[in-house]
Amino acid sequence: MIEVKDINKSFGSNHVLKGISGKFEAGVTNLIIGGSGSGKTTLLKCMIGLHRPEEGTVEYDDREFTKMNFEEKIEIRKEIGMLFQGSALFDSMTVEENIMFPLNMFTEQSTAEKRERVNFCLDRVNLESKNELFPAELSGGMKKRVGIARAIAMNPKYLFVDEPNSGLDPKTSIVIDELIKEITEEYNTTTIVVTHDMNSVMGIGDYILFLHEGKKFWEGSNKEIAHTDIQELNDFVFASRFMKAAKGKF
């Protein structure tokens, strides 16, 4: 479980996060949603240590991350897998080398052991035998799956995913969403997904934290989200044509 308590973060005079609190449980798909500028990506960066909040705490299974020293944070980061918005693959490396990168950094495994782990991860995301391809040879969906394979290479307790469906067609987006949910449940990871995609929200949102203008406006499940009387949330949820058409069916 990851818990954030009263997180405040500013950049100069811009108060981006205003007292955000929330609990993200293991084994379920946790989503942070909101419009552009709502603070969701800043919150994620505070949670993984890329930003330091002025106030508040981030706790990993009751371990207070925000007060740890550098060496202690390194140990936590070994337990974190991260899928970046653009997949962030190294163009000059093969698929195998990309997935092996965290293993090279954080383990003392033999080359054979690392290659075995790479093959396992590729098989898990249905990309077996793609080891020697380069990112330029992959489709957008395949790049995302390689990114997921790299994110789970260290068998992480915590998985962070930033806008996984950005740039993908609807069919591929569903595949990626289902893969994230399967991995979360299979390995009992604490998974946190930042997204503005309502298809993802309705498909895999076990727990949802809605941010608006840097504040937490609502939290709940995808079964509850269409039945609130919070105007800001309704404006966000029903902004898409799909959700407007589906509104009467909930």
Segments predicted by a language model, with ranges:
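A short, proline-enriched helix->beta-strand linker immediately N-terminal to the Walker B motif
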Residues: A153-K157
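Conserved ABC ATPase signature
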Residues: F134-L138, M142
